[in-house]
């Protein structure tokens, strides 16, 4: 902890931030004295300690109130030293009940769980999926008519990518069918990020098996595997932003909405987060937008990486949100590792 702060100053700082998180109203010495010190010290003592905290830039006085609010330095100290990473047993059981349900994919588990976290925090979220970690699981060819077919590319996360192929005759259709068979034989379980390299290695095999090699290369190989390897983002709960007074200003609201859609920001946070492996708090000033905080975790399964970020004002419940994200990360990675529904995992523990 910071040696400059006494135990009493730390208690007062914690009280101010807890009150401000709950009420969004500047905090005066009277509420601190009555609620946190049970009138056991004088009001002058509380005011003096608050003056020290203000001088050290942990709190500040807003223009419209006689009370005090936390500064970014105060929030950073609170998050690092005072916010308890825990949630109530009732909240934990509700999240576990969602995780216990049977889903078709890890993506679905994450989406349903994050929607629950949105609702209990009244904050929006960003789910970033790093696509390059997906594996090719299967390719299917569906003939639509005499000159059109659809190729379905199924990924390890359950995503189905559809590609329409135009051809002129049965020879070209047969070439397409041959290619799909070769790809299923030789490319299944290849990460999408490695497909181009693997395709280079099997080009000569394709050349010996098809009649119109140039058609195959232009219309199938280059077209089908022109799959976006960049991360994709899924934003949930943006309407919840207007609940918070910090975002009543239209310019500030527009700024944070632009942030939510900025893929590079989430990649930047993910890069910083990989050093810790835990749920972390990133303050807005570190990513170029003041007045917000981002609580995030990185879920690493065998085949994919998902970053879950909860976005809100600095006045967010850090411990509660980190507690929820920690449970989500731990349980999803356990489900993936054991390849079992959570209810069966819990029977073994």
UniProtKB/Swiss-Prot annotation:
Biological process according to GO: negative regulation of DNA-templated transcription
Record-linked InterPro entries: GAF-like_dom_sf, HrcA, HrcA_C, WH-like_DNA-bd_sf, WH_DNA-bd_sf, WHTH_transcript_rep_HrcA_IDD
A Pfam family: HrcA
Record keywords: Repressor, Stress response, Transcription, Transcription regulation
Family of the protein in this entry: Belongs to the HrcA family.
Function: Negative regulator of class I heat shock genes (grpE-dnaK-dnaJ and groELS operons). Prevents heat-shock induction of these operons.
The protein, known as: Heat-inducible transcription repressor HrcA
Species per Swiss-Prot/TrEMBL record: Mycoplasmoides gallisepticum (strain R(low / passage 15 / clone 2))
Taxon lineage: Bacteria, Bacillati, Mycoplasmatota, Mycoplasmoidales, Mycoplasmoidaceae
